[in-house]
Amino acid sequence: FNCAYAPVDDWRVFGEIMFLLLGGTGVGYSVQQHHVDELPEIRKPNANRTRRYLINDSIEGWADAVKYLIRSYFFGGSKLRFDYSDIRPKGARLVTSGGKAPGPQPLKECLVKVEGVLSEKEDGSRLSAIEVHDIVCHIADAVLAGGIRRAALISLFSADDKEMIASKSGSWWEKNPQRARANNSAVVVRHRVKESDFFDIWENVKASGAGEPGIYFTNDQDWGTNPCAEIALRPFQFCNLTEINVSDVTTQEELNARATAASFIGTLQATYVDFHYLRPIWQYNTEKDALLGVSMTGIPSGPVLQLDLREAAKTVKEEN
């Protein structure tokens, strides 16, 4: 699946985000205050008791490392001592996904930085929205393919959250370079927003010099979106996108045929809902709303805009 959305209202979401990003799925996530307030209070592990944790060299293994580290700071127990010896060295060939292995270093840096955020907290305290945001960005920093970062994120936050609004102000790229991994957007509920509230955010956008935060208008603050903000998604839901090259399309029949093929492929993909690693809510939502989008690339290179795009869209829906 191309994209997903998850509010960070459960400690297990951190591991799920790692799992999704490693599989190539872009993730929208919410650190709105009413979501992060649902996370448990911090209960640090016992530093005098350590337990070796051997990380399996797989998508699930890397995600588990994040999951169990997070769990150890919410529910106590032994302090984890990670063993990276099973992870393939940098440059090793990846047979299934293709490309070359990044080696253990990106994951090691991720876990050290995530634990750095968690270890600064006191027992009984809670993670703030910006701390949750930074943890997700550190997770995204570990997602590499052939040395190239491949994680796509959008972070939705409460419009009155001053720390998130200022998260890309000043020399943030020196102090918090991980924040480059995500677009940050303030959630604005259409029927509640006042003009003064909007322009308060807008002044911060101008002052940041970074073009952020973005402003995400919604009718329901519990719904989110994908990293490109193309589609509304309920919590723990996927969307599936396919794309057709229309640069050499010259007739309506050609356009309809490609749209039909793309719709068929996307519909077929939408049936693969045994996610095994994710909680059942993901499968339930995906089966309930099997969302599909068909996009076009190469539009300026051909006469496709002279054709009937509504007719092509109709063929997509009929095939789906």
What annotation goes with each model-predicted range?
Residues F1-N320:
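Extended catalytic cores of very large enzyme megasubunits
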